[in-house]
């Protein structure tokens, strides 16, 4: 008799039970690992699967996390074979070529499209009913690519979009007003990146419109120079990359925030990347961030934002820029 047999006596034979809230993270780079740890520490799933083509790095990261199993409630698995991801509820894609210092997000594009041609069909094969969340940059274009390659309905393919930009925006407004970001309501929509659109008309604290108090807010003629805050949001990622080589923690927390809304069926509104054709005068098949409701079925609703003419024009310009790149892609 083995030690195990001496210690434990069986009462019944267990039938294998599938995971009820499995999440997969594709890519164990800085963003993938920050997303993984954020998801684990928020206790969002009963199983976390990780995949990557770099086998040693993957093995090391999985082992390192498994060594902390005592402090977690989640089963952690990893393999370069996508069968490990089978029956995931949410699949988070962070894999891709990393943005170099000074490189625009749009520049990355074709490099990452080629990587997606391998990843997406594998996800679809093993988790045909999952909600696909794209984080890799340029996120809006790659969400479109993932949607096209997966054949999924649009409500099951979302991009992390401007969820992080809006968080940065709210943090910086909070710094200026000496308030917690959760009390500063503000939205950034459009492209995640250089042509994102701050909705100054909607910025409020406790329902008090800041533009109502300062009609010049967000314009060139504003003596308080609020416009600089949006510039800081846009430059924020480049600044972090310049200082530490990559961004990870904030985007990881942002991903976990989105995963939580889906897994817990929260019906919470987030600015995430979705198909905006036909909204705000956008004519082309592009994905941009607008406020969306996230729940168990994915992206269930879109909120109709009241945008000023100037804001709408910026959004359309974003869409044109993205379409210009998209139509050149070989899918």
Curated annotation (Swiss-Prot):
Pathway: Fermentation; pyruvate fermentation to lactate; (S)-lactate from pyruvate: step 1/1. The active site is at residue 192. SUPFAM superfamilies: LDH C-terminal domain-like, NAD(P)-binding Rossmann-fold domains. The keyword NAD applies. CDD domains: LDH_1 (cd05293). Pfam families: Ldh_1_C (PF02866), Ldh_1_N (PF00056). GO terms for biological process: lactate metabolic process. PROSITE patterns: L_LDH. Substrate binds at residues 105, 137, 168, 247. One of its GO terms (molecular function) is L-lactate dehydrogenase activity. NAD(+) binds at residues 29-57, 98, 137. It is found in: Cytoplasm. Keywords: Cytoplasm, NAD, Oxidoreductase. It catalyses: (S)-lactate + NAD(+) = pyruvate + NADH + H(+). InterPro entries: L-lactate/malate_DH, L-lactate_DH, L-lactate_DH_AS, Lactate/malate_DH_C, Lactate/malate_DH_N, Lactate_DH/Glyco_Ohase_4_C, NAD(P)-bd_dom_sf. Interconverts simultaneously and stereospecifically pyruvate and lactate with concomitant interconversion of NADH and NAD(+). This is L-lactate dehydrogenase A chain. It comes from Champsocephalus gunnari. The gene is ldha.
């Amino acid at each position: 008799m083995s030690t195990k047999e001496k210690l434990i006596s069986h009462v019944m034979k267990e039938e294998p039970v599938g995971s009820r809230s499995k999440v997969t993270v594709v890519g164990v780079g800085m963003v993938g690992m920050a997303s993984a740890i954020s998801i684990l520490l928020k206790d969002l799933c009963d199983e976390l699967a990780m995949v990557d083509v770099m086998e040693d790095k993957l093995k090391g990261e999985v082992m390192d996390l498994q060594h902390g199993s005592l402090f977690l409630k989640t089963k952690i698995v990893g393999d370069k074979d996508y069968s490990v991801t089978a029956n995931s509820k949410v699949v988070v894609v962070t894999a891709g070529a990393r943005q170099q210092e000074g490189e625009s997000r749009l520049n990355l594009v074709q490099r990452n499209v080629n990587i997606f041609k391998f990843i997406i069909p594998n996800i679809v094969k093993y988790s045909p009913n999952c909600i696909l969340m794209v984080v890799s940059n340029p996120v809006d274009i790659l969400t479109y690519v993932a949607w096209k390659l997966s054949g999924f309905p649009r409500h099951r393919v979302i991009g992390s979009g401007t969820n992080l930009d809006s968080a940065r925006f709210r943090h910086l407004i909070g710094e200026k007003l000496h308030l917690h970001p959760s009390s500063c309501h503000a939205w950034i929509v459009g492209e995640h990146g250089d042509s994102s659109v701050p909705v100054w008309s909607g910025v409020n604290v406790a329902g008090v419109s800041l533009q109502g108090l300062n009609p010049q807010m967000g314009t060139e003629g504003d003596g308080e120079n609020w416009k600089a805050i949006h510039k800081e949001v846009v430059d924020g990622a480049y600044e972090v990359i310049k200082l530490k080589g990559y961004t990870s923690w904030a985007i990881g927390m942002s991903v976990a925030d989105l995963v939580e809304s889906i897994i817990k069926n929260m019906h919470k509104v987030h600015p995430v990347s979705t198909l905006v054709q036909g909204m705000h005068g956008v004519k082309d098949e592009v994905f941009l961030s607008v406020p969306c409701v996230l729940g168990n079925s994915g992206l269930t609703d879109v909120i109709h934002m009241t945008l000023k003419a100037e804001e709408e024009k910026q959004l359309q310009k974003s869409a044109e820029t993205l379409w210009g790149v998209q139509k050149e892609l070989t899918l």
